[in-house]
A protein has these predicted regions:
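Feature responds to low-complexity, polar/acidic, surface-exposed segments characteristic
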Residues: 1-18, 23-46, 50-79, 88-108, ...
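Histidine- and acidic-residue-rich, metal-dependent catalytic cores
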Residues: 85
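Structured, solvent-exposed acidic/aromatic patches
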Residues: 153-157, 162-164
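Short nucleic-acid-contacting surface segments enriched for D/E, G, S/T with interspersed K/R
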Residues: 224-237
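Single conserved hydrophobic/aromatic residue that forms the stacking wall/gate
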Residues: 261-272
């Protein structure tokens, strides 16, 4: 038997490829897809940056490494992501020894971090901050369809779009950034399915009392975002532990995953035959 696992779009807000990709990479979870207009904090943006980088799978393995900034203790949910973002030079703390993880991230801060993610040196840009950074981001297409102005706070949808545009943009060395992460980039679109297949496990048929080996962040049930990862008897499920995602299908026969596809219409369904 052959099956095709769909990366679902269960509502209008999820029809955007940027949102789907952010969820797939772990930059966002199902709780945030319900409030896409919520402002993104510096701590949350550090996580999003790392999720769109080569460090996305190793960040959660760092554990408690001690206090990074006086307002980011090692026990903070943002600590591993802030550590990586700062060590890689994508974000900076403040001279008073704080990171201010709860401050909202602005357009110019987010664009600057994205440019650094792409390997651009701020000293090579023409002009002064933030005009130089915003102009370079515009030139590279990072601000495509991003309706924010200087000093405006970024919400989750904005950040997902900015980082999706980063995947399709050229790095300082001239290659599409997404390809360096193993994605296929074509005509401004990013296909993450090849990466997902490497970490995908299943299909499995749930028995009475079956438990997942991890607590998923993103849950899809019958191609719709769900808040519950409860497995019922005979549910067919797939999961990616590294992406902290599970796909559950009720009353469907098991098959073998051969490919994953992205769709944008909420009425499309995956099939298993």
């Amino acid at each position: 038997a052959v099956s095709v696992l769909v990366l679902p779009a269960s509502a209008a807000s999820l029809n955007n490829s940027a949102i789907q990709t952010a969820i797939t990479l772990g930059a966002m979870d199902t709780s945030q897809t319900g409030s896409l207009d919520a402002a993104v904090t510096r701590g949350a943006f550090a996580k999003m940056l790392v999720s769109f980088s080569a460090y996305r799978e190793s960040a959660s393995q760092q554990g408690n490494l001690g206090t990074l900034y006086k307002d980011v203790p090692g026990s903070s949910q943002w600590a591993p992501y802030v550590r990586i973002a700062v060590q890689q030079g994508w974000m900076n703390g403040y001279t008073d020894g704080t990171f201010r993880p709860d401050n909202t991230v602005t357009l110019e801060e987010a664009c600057t971090a994205a440019l650094k993610l792409l390997g651009y040196k701020m000293t090579d840009l023409n002009g002064v901050f933030p005009t130089a950074q915003l102009n370079k981001a515009q030139e590279l297409g990072l601000r495509n369809q991003l309706n924010r102005s200087q000093s405006e706070a970024m919400n989750y949808e904005d950040c997902a779009l900015l980082l999706y545009n980063t995947l399709t943009a050229n790095t300082a060395s001239g290659s599409a950034y997404g390809t360096s992460l193993g994605f296929t980039v074509s005509n401004g679109q990013v296909d993450t399915s090849t990466v997902m297949l490497k970490s995908l496990k299943g299909p499995f048929v749930a028995a009475e009392g079956t438990q997942l080996p991890f607590t998923p962040v993103s849950i899809y049930r019958n191609d719709k975002v769900s808040a519950s990862a409860e497995l019922n008897r005979y549910d067919v499920y797939y999961y990616s532990e590294s992406l902290q995602t599970v796909w559950i299908y009720t009353r469907k026969a098991a098959g073998r995953i051969l490919s994953l596809i992205h769709i944008s219409e909420p009425t499309r369904r995956s099939y298993i035959s």
